[in-house]
Each structure stands twice: as C-alpha cells, then as structure tokens.
C-alpha cells in the first residue's frame, strides 16, 4: 500500500510513545478483525489533557493514528477530545486507503473510551 508522507512520518517518528507512571486513566482497544492494539495513557489537569501517551501493536496507519491523536488531543477538554473523528485523522493524513480506515476508527474508539474513563475518574475524585 502507498501511504502519504504524513502517515509515514508519524509511523517512522511517532510522537508521545510510552507509558505514564501516574495516569488519570488508561484504556486499551483491540480491533477484533485485524488484531491491532492501541493503548492510551492520559493525565488531566484543570479539565484538559495535560499529557497523552500511547503504545500500538499494529499496522503502519494504526501506529500513525495513535501518534497523531496524542498531538491532536493535547490541551483539549474532554468534550473536545471526544469530538475528534476518524474523518479528521484521515484528512490530516491526506486520506487513507479503504483497507486502512480501521486504523482511524480504532484511534477514535480508544479516544472515546478514554474520555469516558476520564469522566468517570473525575466523578470519583469529586465524591458523593
């Protein structure tokens, strides 16, 4: 498959790879069809994403999408985080081949699950 320079840049030089020692939340998503796995760690401060890291075991566009979302979500509120779409990821990459759309969808599913986990953890911090 032929990927854009932007996809290849994020694959060869992924941003924000790794784990966060004391995250506000951690989520892991697996694509049941192809087996790609994306794990996200996040820290929230003052209602915004202060730090976001990822690890991905998957295809070129899955790694690239994981890298891209860590940059795109930085500094965003939880509502803004959950509003990121697969279409935005694909547009940022100048498109993806049809067989690779699963990569942007996996990244968005992980972001949505992360947003839910962060909302839940914030409710727990507030107490009854």
Model-flagged regions — what are they?
Residues 1-21, 26-27, 37, 50, ...:
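C-terminal binding/interaction regions
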Residues 31, 36-46:
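Short beta-strand elements
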Residues 34, 56-65, 103:
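Short, thiol/selenol-centered motifs that function as redox-active sites or metal-ligating centers
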Residues 43, 47-48, 52-61:
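A short interface-forming secondary-structure element
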Residues 61, 65-76:
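Alpha-helical support elements that line or immediately flank enzyme active sites
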